[in-house]
A protein has these predicted regions:
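N-terminal active-site segment of His-dependent metallophosphoesterases
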Residues: 1-46, 117, 128
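Short glycine- and Lys/Arg-enriched binding-loop motifs that mark or flank ligand-binding interfaces
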Residues: 29, 52, 83
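Conserved catalytic scaffold of divalent metal-dependent phosphoesterases
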Residues: 5-13, 59-141
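A generic structural signal for short beta-strands and their flanking turns/coil linkers
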Residues: 47-49, 68
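Structured loop/turn residues at beta-strand edges in well-structured enzyme cores
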Residues: 24, 49, 136-137
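Short glycine/serine/threonine-biased micro-segments
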Residues: 31, 54, 87
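Short, polar loop motifs at secondary-structure junctions
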Residues: 35-39, 56-62
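Short hydrophobic/aromatic-enriched beta-strand-loop microsegments
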Residues: 49-57, 74-75
Length: 141
């Protein structure tokens, strides 16, 4: 499966200088946030493939005008073409803006989906034994 992953900056190669066939062979597009809704709508239209996204810390506008033709997977466990995808958008808390989370808030978001993760054959792991606060975030396996 070929997956195009995009985030943070629109690619002129795909956006400004698009030519038919440029996205040929792509099976799915994943957006990790901080892109214009119009860019994502363009990609899903031109590729004619599923586009899944999570909002980034600069995507507050998605609430009023989400990308057309795209699926938000923030806080969801989905299966596309046999591939399980768990989406968590946002960033570490730095200014209190939308889609910013403390470690405890992100841990709570993950634990909320614990039953879906386990039902899909995954498991939740607790904090690592490392001392770095960044390394102690809970993760889904």
């Amino acid at each position: 499966m070929k997956i195009l992953i995009v985030s943070d900056e629109e690619s002129p190669y795909l956006w400004d200088y698009y030519t038919p066939g440029r996205l040929a062979g792509i099976d799915m597009i994943l957006s990790a946030g901080d892109l214009k809704a119009s860019y994502l709508s363009f990609l899903v239209t031109m590729a004619n493939r599923p586009l899944l996204y999570v909002p980034g810390n600069h995507d507050a506008a998605y609430a009023a005008a989400p990308p057309e033709g795209c699926d938000c997977v923030d806080g969801k466990l989905v299966t596309v073409n046999g591939l399980r995808i768990l989406g968590f958008g946002g960033s570490p808390m730095y200014s209190g803006g939308p889609h910013q989370y403390t470690e405890r808030q992100m841990e709570a978001r993950i634990r909320k989906l614990g039953w879906k993760i386990r039902r899909a054959g995954g498991r939740l792991r607790g904090p690592s034994k490392r001392t770095s606060a960044q390394d102690e975030a809970f993760c889904a396996a």
